[in-house]
Design a protein with these regions (language model features):
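Transmembrane helical elements of multi-pass membrane transporters/channels
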Residues: 28-32, 36, 40, 58-120, ...
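Functionally critical, cavity-lining and gating residues within the transmembrane helices
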Residues: 3, 20, 78-82, 93, ...
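Small-residue-rich hydrophobic transmembrane alpha-helices
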Residues: 99-163, 194-217
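Residue-level hotspots within the lipid-embedded alpha helices of multi-pass solute transporters
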Residues: 26, 71-79, 91, 108, ...
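Helix-terminus/linker motif at the lipid-water interface of multi-pass membrane proteins
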Residues: 9-16, 76-109, 127, 165-174, ...
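Short alpha-helical transmembrane segments in multi-pass integral membrane proteins
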Residues: 2, 13-69, 125-190, 232-276
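Alpha-helical transmembrane segments of multipass membrane proteins
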Residues: 4-12, 37, 83-87, 109, ...
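Alpha-helical transmembrane segments and their helix-entry boundary regions
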Residues: 21-22, 97, 210-214, 243-244
């Protein structure tokens, strides 16, 4: 939210362009870090942060890294795959690029609740597997998925109905608004595939199994999406709609593979931390 607000301020109000977007990102990250540190240092519970007591616990660090690095790489893979799509979008001119930028800003806001539910699934599954309650862990994942579907459906209504107006917040040029509205209405109905991928990936991370979701995402968002873009642009149709559909195509492949893996995954033997 801070990033989006600062984007609007620096780009629309101050006319800073790309430089404004960069400053907005840096400031938003700094604000987030400071607020998080402040809350943790004032918290009275078991996760209170006391800087003078910071120590390395190597066994725990090894477990954190084994889960954290693949999870971080998943985020990097997503950003890296977006570069491929952006490269093809750039061929359609400045107006299309601006419309795509507006779409991605709105996209980040719409998928934020789903990403939060994914993180909640990670925590919920980890806690329940820690006490050996596999059934409750899986039940929580199902409810998180249904909730993500419901939230996405509610958010889709204003996105689909108000697509031109939402795009005009970022750029009021008619051609840009046309591209942005087209992309919003074309791609946003496919967010339900994104829900499946995010919730089940979060659940697998909570079970301490973050490598397979990383490999699935690498294959779907980088390998498959790049093959799709190359074949589509060079042999089928180098138009904005089929090129943009590389996004939901990647989501579909990723969600199908993640769901298939999750349904065949036995959680009974997963327990990241034996005793705390």
């Amino acid at each position: 939210m801070v990033t989006t607000a600062l984007d609007l301020l620096f780009v629309l109000q101050f006319g800073m362009g790309v430089e404004g977007v960069a400053y907005a990102t840096i400031i938003a990250q700094a604000v987030s870090a400071i607020l998080t540190m402040t809350v943790l240092m004032r918290y009275d519970g078991s996760i209170r942060l006391e800087l003078r007591k910071l120590r390395f616990h190597w066994d725990m660090l090894k477990k954190i890294v084994s889960v954290g690095i693949p999870a971080a790489l998943q985020m990097a893979i997503t950003a890296f795959s977006n570069v491929f799509v952006q490269g093809y979008i750039n061929h359609f001119g400045a107006d299309c690029m601006s419309g795509w930028t507006a779409y991605t800003k709105i996209d980040q806001l719409v998928i934020l609740p789903v990403q939060s539910l994914s993180m909640a699934s990670t925590t919920f599954v980890g806690q329940n597997l820690g006490v050996g309650n596999v059934a409750r862990a899986k039940g929580g994942v199902r409810r998180a998925l249904l909730l993500s579907f419901a939230v996405t459906a509610v958010l889709l209504v204003p996105v689909l109905l108000l697509a031109p107006g939402l795009t005009s917040f970022f750029n009021s040029k008619a051609e840009v608004v046309s591209y942005g509205a087209l992309l919003l209405r074309l791609l946003s109905p496919f967010y339900f595939f994104f829900c499946i991928n995010q919730i089940y990936s979060g659940a697998l991370r909570g079970a301490g199994n973050s490598r397979m979701p990383m490999f699935i995402m690498l294959g779907s968002f980088v390998v498959f999406r790049q093959i799709y873009l190359y074949v589509m642009a060079n042999y089928i149709s180098n138009e904005i709609v089929p090129i943009a559909l590389s996004y939901p195509a990647g989501w579909f492949v990723c969600s199908a593979a993640t769901l298939l893996y999750y349904t065949h995954c036995k959680f009974d033997h997963y327990r990241l931390v034996e005793d705390v």
